[in-house]
Amino acid sequence: MVKAVVLVKSPKKLIAARLKQVSLVNESFSVSGQFDAVAIIEVNELTQIKDVTIEIQKIAGVERTETMIQVQ
């Protein structure tokens, strides 16, 4: 399993709830600071992280994302 954290910038207030609807997003919540929400994803293959991130970027109102992949 590969875990990653995706930080999401979006003015939409319900972005964290919308992130939960994305396939392979295990958890999401709103945060304060430079980003507005965090999505925790778990995938079997490293290449799937890109697919999930692209899906998140397609959500209306998402301005930018930053992804951090767990290192072992």
Please tell me what each predicted stretch does.
Residues M1-Q72:
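A compositional/biophysical signature of low hydrophobicity enriched in polar/charged and small residues
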